[in-house]
């Protein structure tokens, strides 16, 4: 009889910063390295593994063994714990689209560092025209009194983002197609607050138009109604504060005035710092 001692209903949620760090480590790898590995950091709660950070572990793979700088990995983890004490080791990652023969050896080390570690693979070679991401757990198999082994079994993996990460991703998306279009800027900067409000308002108007079109199509029996969408719209309506147009205009104008005041003060501080820098340089030159 075979034995399986690990639940397979886990869900792995990976944050974009983890993917960026893996790609950066792959780009900085040694010329003789075929793949890069590292440690995954995060938390586990009710069957959900939240991967929020990671770091690279230098290693070399030979035909019959794996050499990894475990002392470096331990020191780096201890340093990270001082900054982020809530992040624990939850598994390890590797570049490539497949689980190799050395994966079980590396997994044994992480099994000593945490319970039920996960294994994350990222296809940095873009073999399928996209950066495929997969997650695995190692399932123990064996016969009582006989030989034992393990098998990497795929589990569900999702991309999850905090609100600041979404803002960063939106900025990164503006550089898509730079190589094909030389007229597009190679770098982007965060927009001013007023420009962000304008862009958000335009997006909100577009989304409201889509919602109105959906409601009108349902009322005209051009589209089948969806109960989940109806409940979401009802919750949205209930979340809107009950106020008159004059009250809303007064509140909006007050917030805009506060925003303009903050922008003005920040520009004054920036100008003062630039002036102070020039005066300091001039004083040093005179002396």
Swiss-Prot record:
PROSITE patterns: MPN. Keywords: Cytoplasm, Initiation factor, Protein biosynthesis. Pfam families: JAB, MitMem_reg. The keyword Protein biosynthesis applies. One of its GO terms (biological process) is formation of cytoplasmic translation initiation complex. It comes from the Eukaryota. One of its GO terms (molecular function) is translation initiation factor binding. The keyword Lipoprotein does not apply. GO terms for cellular component: eukaryotic 43S preinitiation complex; eukaryotic 48S preinitiation complex; eukaryotic translation initiation factor 3 complex, eIF3m. Residues 12-142 form the MPN domain. It is found in: Cytoplasm. Belongs to the eIF-3 subunit F family. Component of the eukaryotic translation initiation factor 3 (eIF-3) complex. Component of the eukaryotic translation initiation factor 3 (eIF-3) complex, which is involved in protein synthesis of a specialized repertoire of mRNAs and, together with other initiation factors, stimulates binding of mRNA and methionyl-tRNAi to the 40S ribosome. The eIF-3 complex specifically targets and initiates translation of a subset of mRNAs involved in cell proliferation. This is Eukaryotic translation initiation factor 3 subunit F. It comes from Aedes aegypti (Yellowfever mosquito). The gene is eIF3-S5.
